[in-house]
């Protein structure tokens, strides 16, 4: 219950401190600062999110929640969570919600290194994916944050996943302190040509592909994935 109330407070705090009161789209991503599939409150909050947004005074034509998961193999309730979220996405939101799998590589050995051996194998993920219902609205997403070292085999991806269910999203490794310290290649990442080598083979295989090219301004403003902005002042009235 405390987590549920915290999520409600977070959304309310964001909206109340913005001057925008009308928007075409309000996105909420359950991701990155904690694996959402460990938290059943995410499912419950997905149901009440529209009402929370409305009660805060924001008029949004579309409220679009997204669950992004690295598919932890220690979570015995993982598939049940994902199937329940698919029901929320497809039925409650009429397709206007998202489910994203952080795949990151089509090579299991590289994935074990990237996820510290805490994610399911590609074979297991493929089996779970085959049992997902056909998506309404936007397809489910296979996410690949890419660097020069990323292994992304388009033919292997086609063997593992259904193109009718999934799209591929190619994103950057943002230029955070952690990324630099761990030796990820982030130079030139705001140049579209960096991603073309990954995109073209996927297109040739018949995949729908989204390429997200960031801007330096996003990292400078610390609004991207992997960044946390901590106030230097003291918190009051909390």
Residue ranges of each PLM-predicted region?
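Alpha-helix N-cap and loop-to-helix initiation/capping positions
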Residues: 3-6, 41-44, 115-120, 186-193
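Conserved Radical SAM active-site core
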Residues: 1-94
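Short helix-capping and hinge/turn segments at secondary-structure transitions, especially at repeat
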Residues: 54, 105, 130-134
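Auxiliary Fe-S-binding modules of radical SAM enzymes
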Residues: 121, 127-238
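Alpha-helical scaffolding segments of alpha/beta enzyme cores, especially the outer helices
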Residues: 13, 44-51, 80-87, 124-128, ...
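Short, well-ordered coil/turn segments that N-cap beta-strands
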Residues: 22-26, 60-64, 93-97, 134-140, ...
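Conserved radical SAM core fold
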Residues: 33-38, 67-76, 90-118, 136-142, ...
């Amino acid at each position: 219950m405390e987590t549920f109330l915290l999520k409600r407070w977070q959304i309310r705090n964001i909206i109340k401190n913005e001057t925008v009161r009308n928007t075409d789209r309000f996105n909420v991503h359950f991701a990155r600062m904690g694996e959402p599939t460990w938290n059943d409150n995410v499912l419950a909050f997905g149901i009440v999110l529209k009402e929370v947004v409305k009660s805060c005074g924001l008029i949004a034509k579309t409220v679009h929640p997204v669950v992004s998961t690295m598919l932890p193999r220690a979570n015995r309730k993982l598939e049940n969570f994902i199937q329940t979220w698919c029901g929320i996405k497809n039925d409650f939101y009429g397709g206007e919600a998202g489910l994203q799998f952080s795949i990151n590589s089509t090579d299991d050995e590289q994935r074990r290194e990237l996820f510290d051996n805490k994610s399911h194998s590609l074979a297991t993920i493929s089996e779970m994916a085959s049992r997902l219902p056909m998506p309404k609205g936007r397809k489910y997403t296979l996410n690949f944050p890419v660097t020069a070292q990323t292994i992304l085999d388009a033919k292997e991806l086609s063997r593992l996943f259904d193109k009718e269910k999934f799209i591929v999203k190619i994103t950057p490794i943002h230029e955070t302190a952690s990324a630099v310290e761990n030796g990820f290649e982030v130079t030139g990442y705001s140049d579209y040509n960096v991603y073309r080598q990954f995109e073209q083979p996927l297109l040739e295989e018949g995949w729908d592909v989204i390429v997200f090219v960031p801007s330096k301004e996003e990292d400078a403003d610390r609004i991207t994935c992997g960044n946390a902005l901590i106030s230097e002042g003291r918190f009051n009235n909390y």
